[in-house]
């Protein structure tokens, strides 16, 4: 019985080698094939002129090439002095949807990509968690989001190109570690289309400690950001019940110390300030205790409004007082500006238009 063809873009490098072996081709050809797919972005096997015609025919018998499709585009100039923040709703070949965001900044252009369709963690302040979990994205589907944003730039004849990549879109990257790592390699390999420095790639996580440990041992030089939001275990459990209970703060801190030590990169602790929840002087002092003694920096983030979620952002004075307490203790602190709020493209707002109307999310 003839096997049904599948999308070759969903295969990692190790899987490409296995696929070639299955059709009696040498595994070393996987590097050529991989470059055609993820650097040259070949649209068909006929485009792969450095591969023999018999090999191209065999590949076409077992596989097809299908890129994700951009279904919707939104943009806003609000809050961004460097240009429009833009969001793409992307439909994957099986009909699932994800969102990806282009964020302009001084001397940089950042692609914010999703690692999963939906999310199973259900953090209380996040729109993606309201969707539930659909599935992990393949490394090709993650890479394809950067391609889609890059295509958008080129179509408008912008001189700017994507310089930074952050895994801060939909889903938990470290519950899809193998495909995230493969996507990082796709996007950072020298002489490939993007060749992005790994030090300009940030992987964000709620704190999946075994995967943080695994990431630290890969030799990758990516940066790590952790959604902390409270240094008090009980409060963190209320905000992020699944992640906080399964990966307690003490165990998380051990992993963060190990990551910073092995990579030489500071860990970013993301802290979303929520009015009356985690914004007190006591909260700041507990954060000081938690963050002291290892290589880290703190990003304070404003809460972005989400329908059916009742948190409130803090006022400017509260945010600045909280920052000052941390800085007076010697911590490196940045107040992170949120871009894309009017189009539901800011931190915590991505939900893949799951109601059919992104304006309602």
From Swiss-Prot:
Coiled coil: none
Binding site for S-adenosyl-L-methionine: 171-172, 204, 227-229, 304
Any one GO MF annotation of this record: tRNA binding
Superkingdom per UniProt: Bacteria
Documented EC number(s): 2.1.1.192
GO biological process, one term: tRNA methylation
Protein name: Probable dual-specificity RNA methyltransferase RlmN
Organism whose genome encodes this protein: Chlorobium luteolum (strain DSM 273 / BCRC 81028 / 2530)
Lineage per the UniProt record: Bacteria, Pseudomonadati, Chlorobiota, Chlorobiia, Chlorobiales
Primary gene name: rlmN
């Amino acid at each position: 019985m003839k096997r049904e063809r599948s999308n070759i873009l969903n295969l990692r490098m190790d899987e490409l080698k296995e696929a070639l072996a299955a059709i009696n081709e040498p595994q070393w050809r996987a590097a050529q094939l991989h470059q055609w797919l993820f650097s040259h972005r070949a649209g068909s096997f006929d485009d792969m002129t450095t591969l023999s015609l018999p090999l191209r025919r065999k590949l076409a018998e077992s596989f097809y090439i299908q890129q994700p499709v951009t279904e919707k585009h939104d943009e806003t100039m609000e809050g961004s002095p460097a240009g429009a923040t833009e969001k793409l709703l992307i439909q994957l070949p099986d009909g699932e949807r994800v969102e990806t965001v282009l964020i302009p900044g001084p001397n940089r252009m950042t692609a914010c990509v999703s690692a999963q369709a939906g999310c199973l963690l259900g953090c209380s302040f996040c729109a993606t968690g309201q969707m539930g979990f659909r599935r992990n994205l393949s490394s090709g589907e993650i890479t394809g989001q950067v391609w889609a944003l890059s295509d958008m730039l080129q179509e408008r004849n912008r001189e700017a190109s994507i310089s930074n990549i952050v895994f801060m879109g939909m889903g938990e990257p470290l519950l899809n570690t193998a495909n995230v790592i493969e996507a990082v390699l796709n996007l950072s390999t020298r002489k490939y289309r993007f060749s992005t420095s790994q030090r300009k790639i940030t992987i964000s996580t709620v704190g999946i400690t075994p995967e943080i440990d695994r990431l630290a041992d890969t030799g990758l030089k990516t940066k790590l950001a952790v959604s902390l939001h409270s240094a008090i275990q009980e409060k963190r459990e209320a905000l992020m019940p699944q992640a906080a209970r399964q990966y307690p703060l003490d165990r998380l801190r051990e992993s963060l110390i190990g990551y910073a030590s092995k990579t030489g990169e500071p860990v970013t602790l993301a802290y979303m300030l929520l009015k009356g929840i985690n914004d007190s002087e006591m909260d700041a002092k507990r954060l000081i205790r938690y963050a002291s003694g290892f290589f880290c920096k703190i990003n304070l983030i404003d809460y972005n409004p989400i329908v059916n979620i009742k948190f409130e952002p803090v006022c400017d004075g509260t945010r600045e007082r909280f920052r000052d307490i941390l800085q007076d203790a010697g911590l490196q602190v940045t107040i992170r500006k949120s871009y894309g709020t009017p189009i539901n493209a800011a931190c915590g707002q991505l939900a893949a238009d799951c109601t059919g109307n992104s304006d309602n999310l």
